[in-house]
């Protein structure tokens, strides 16, 4: 089956996305079961689902890395990307959407649209991905299909058009009305493979008629021929409805809504049928855009296996057995194993070791991947997320993906000295896999710092260090990097005299120290040789070393400049060391007179919240010593811009989630340093001592 050649029109590259716990992985499992890829269905709550293949995912029952899987249904090849629903992992969703042609959004029938659904939907809008919705968990207490459809319209402003209605709900959910065919499907067994196609039950004929009329009106909006027939009261065939629906979905004008219970195996085959009938093939989407690496001029590539190669590496993962895997979407051309490709972002040639198609965590080796296919490459050395692979004779750079800056950082150290190098290698590998994770060394404390998108994100990173890389480590509390500066222009003396038999030490200098906006500056204004030239650099060094630890709380001193204007020396006792000490003494004396103050990092914060929570959120920002800069409306929400001290932003993600019922999100980045109020300064000094 897998070796059969499929024409591009019979390819479907789709993502399955949802809020955490809407039943997305379960739905994917059922799809794999019905398409004959798995022989036993894995249950998420037993920790055995095929798609969730990292240990942490099986324990937590959530999906963290998006696994790309190939399966087959009704003579079509379907490539499915399972994406995580937790807010800390939106980067995975962002990457998946970049390489998909269509998406299935799964909602929980008792909750409808949830916060992460909104985030993912906005991301899909950016990439203009055609979508359909599967309302899952119809068998659960509180399941309400029509309420869920309502939330799609109200919260996402989607033109949601039901193609089905459930027969019964909760325990009595027994089948589905197909509004396109105008009949019903009643399930007869637990695996959902035995079903009866029958007439619509008598007690539901009226509501079915009402919703079928709404369906016909929606397709008439996108197809003029149907509009004419509809207005003239002519019969519209099932085929005509399907063709018009497909047209509406591809133009992002219609969002078809289906229902079922993946866990109870109801509605999944109908979902598969709809994916094939209404989701785009690689031929239906626009040719992929890119730029010529040297000239920067825009170019496109068609979805054609005979065209020059253009492929995008959208995820890097490390497999314990075969090493680095680069998950790749081929947009045009053909990639063959054992050949060379050109990485146009890095300007390097790379050799393709093997090409594999993934089924969750099982692999199938293939000789080639063609336009429209998704697969993983083994053997690439320099390729990272977002890189383009192409022919060096026909280079192209596909548009790069933009990833948010990390917003939280903590210090990390190995439990043993021997673990230091091992930890460094492991962190570099993890940073390569995940562009929203950063690692660096704090120059002031020498600590290794890891930064990421949220607390769960960093927890999972630390967890992977322990499990995959066998590095035991201690993790600190999130920290703020304070600085010190001066406010007054002062003069000060530094005099170091040491006489203890034999040769003594003598260094003496006078400096002026003044505040400045820029970097540290040292000016030598000594005239008449009161300090010999060879000792001047020693004074500069002494001042710079002393400035690494200020007099308020021992933080580095910034934004000052020094003018050396006088001093004296001794023919025998003067030395570089003596003048270095004199320089540091002059600096400390000057600082004690110059109104020294503590500075803290001020962050530029943007919060996106639905209007009804705005008052609460603004009040909370003010209570964090925030300064509101402005507000602008954006698609049913408000964007609040403010400057807030970093020390007040710890734990903000959790507060924002609870204040907005999870519907708000925010980004922050460092903007500038500013003076700390006296009361806070005293508190910081107290904590340092």
UniProtKB/Swiss-Prot annotation:
GO terms for MF: GTP binding; GTPase activity; translation elongation factor activity; translation release factor activity, codon nonspecific
Main location: cytoplasm
Residues annotated as domain tr-type G: 9-283
Listed InterPro entries: EF-G-like_DII, EFG_II, EFG_III, EFG_III/V, EFG_IV, EFG_V, EFG_V-like, G_TR_CS
Domain of life: Bacteria
The UniProt record lists the keyword GTP-binding: yes
SUPFAM superfamilies registered for this protein in UniProt: EF-G C-terminal domain-like (SSF54980), P-loop containing nucleoside triphosphate hydrolases (SSF52540), Ribosomal protein S5 domain 2-like (SSF54211), Translation proteins (SSF50447)
Entry-linked Pfam families: EF-G_D2, EFG_C, EFG_III, EFG_IV, GTP_EFTU
Subcellular localization: Cytoplasm
GO CC annotations, alphabetized: cytosol
SMART domains to which the protein is assigned, alphabetical: EFG_C, EFG_IV
GO biological process: translational termination
Keywords annotated in UniProt: Cytoplasm, Elongation factor, GTP-binding, Nucleotide-binding, Protein biosynthesis
Chain residues that bind GTP: 18-25, 82-86, 136-139
Family: Belongs to the TRAFAC class translation factor GTPase superfamily. Classic translation factor GTPase family. EF-G/EF-2 subfamily.
UniProt xrefs under PANTHER family: RIBOSOME-RELEASING FACTOR 2, MITOCHONDRIAL (PTHR43261:SF1), TRANSLATION ELONGATION FACTOR G-RELATED (PTHR43261)
Protein name: Elongation factor G
UniProt gene name: fusA
């Amino acid at each position: 089956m897998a070796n059969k050649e499929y024409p591009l029109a019979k390819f479907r590259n789709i993502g399955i996305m949802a809020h955490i716990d809407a039943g997305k992985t379960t739905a994917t499992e059922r799809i794999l079961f019905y398409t004959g890829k798995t022989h036993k269905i894995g249950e998420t709550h037993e920790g055995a689902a095929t798609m969730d293949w990292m240990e942490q995912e099986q324990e937590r029952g959530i999906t963290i890395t998006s696994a790309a899987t190939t399966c087959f249904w009704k003579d079509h090849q379907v490539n499915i990307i399972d994406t995580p629903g937790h807010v800390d992992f939106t980067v995975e969703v962002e990457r998946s959407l970049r390489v998909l042609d269509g998406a299935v959004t799964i909602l929980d029938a008792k909750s409808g649209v949830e916060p992460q659904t909104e985030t993912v939907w906005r991301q899909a809008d950016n990439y203009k991905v055609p979508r359909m919705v599967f309302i899952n968990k119809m068998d659960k207490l509180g399941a309400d299909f029509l309420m869920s459809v309502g939330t799609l319209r109200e919260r996402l402003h989607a033109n949601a058009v039901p193609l089905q209605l459930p027969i019964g709900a909760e325990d009595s959910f027994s089948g589905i009305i197909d509004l396109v065919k105008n009949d019903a499907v009643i399930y007869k067994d637990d695996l959902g493979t035995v079903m009866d196609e029958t007439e619509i039950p008598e007690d539901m004929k009226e509501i079915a008629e009402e919703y079928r009329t709404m369906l016909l009106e929606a397709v008439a909006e996108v197809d003029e021929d149907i509009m004419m027939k509809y207005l003239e009261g002519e019969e519209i065939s099932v085929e005509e409805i399907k063709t018009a629906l497909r047209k509406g979905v591809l133009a992002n004008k219609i969002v078809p809504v289906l229902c079922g219970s993946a866990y109870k195996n109801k509605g999944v085959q109908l979902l598969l049928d709809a994916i094939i009938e209404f989701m785009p093939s690689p031929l239906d989407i626009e040719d992929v855009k890119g730029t010529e690496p040297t000239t920067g001029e825009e170019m496109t590539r068609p979805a054609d296996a005979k065209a020059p190669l253009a492929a995008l590496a959208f995820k890097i993962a490390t497999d314990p057995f075969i090493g680095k895997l680069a998950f790749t979407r081929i947009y045009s051309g053909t990639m063959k194993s054992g050949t060379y490709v050109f990485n146009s972002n890095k300007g390097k040639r790379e050799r393709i070791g093997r090409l594999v198609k993934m089924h969750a965590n099982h692999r199938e080796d293939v000789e080639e991947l063609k336009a429209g296919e998704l697969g993983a490459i083994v053997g690439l050395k320099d390729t990272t997320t977002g890189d383009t692979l192409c022919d060096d004779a026909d280079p192209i750079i596909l548009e790069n993906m933009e990833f948010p800056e990390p917003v939280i950082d903590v210090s990390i150290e190995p439990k043993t000295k021997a673990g230091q190098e091992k930890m460094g290698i492991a962190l570099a590998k993890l940073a390569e896999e995940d562009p929203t994770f950063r690692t660096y060394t704090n120059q002031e404390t020498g600590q290794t710092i890891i930064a990421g998108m949220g607390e769960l994100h960093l927890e999972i990173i630390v967890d992977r260090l322990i499990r995959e890389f066998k590095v035991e480590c201690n993790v600190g509390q999130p920290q703020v990097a304070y600085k010190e500066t001066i406010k007054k222009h002062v003069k000060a003396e530094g005099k170091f005299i040491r006489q203890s038999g034999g040769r003594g030490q003598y260094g003496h200098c006078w400096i002026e120290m003044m505040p400045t906006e820029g970097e540290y500056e040292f000016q030598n204004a000594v005239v008449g040789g009161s300090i010999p030239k060879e000792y001047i650099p020693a004074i500069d060094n002494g001042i710079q070393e002393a400035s690494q630890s200020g007099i308020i709380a021992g933080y580095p001193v910034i934004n000052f400049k020094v003018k050396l204007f006088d001093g004296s020396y001794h023919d025998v006792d003067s030395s570089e060391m003596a003048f270095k000490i004199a320089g540091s003494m002059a600096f400390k004396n000057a600082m004690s007179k110059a109104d020294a103050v503590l500075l803290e990092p001020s962050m530029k914060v943007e919060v996106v919240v639905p209007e009804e929570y705005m008052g609460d959120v603004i009040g909370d920002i003010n209570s964090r010593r925030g300064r509101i800069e402005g507000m602008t409306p954006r698609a049913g929400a408000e964007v609040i811009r403010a400057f807030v001290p970093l020390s007040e932003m710890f734990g903000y993600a959790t507060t924002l989630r609870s204040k907005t019922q999870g519907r708000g999100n925010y980004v922050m980045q460092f903007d500038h340093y500013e003076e700390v109020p006296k009361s806070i300064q005293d508190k910081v000094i107290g904590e340092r001592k």
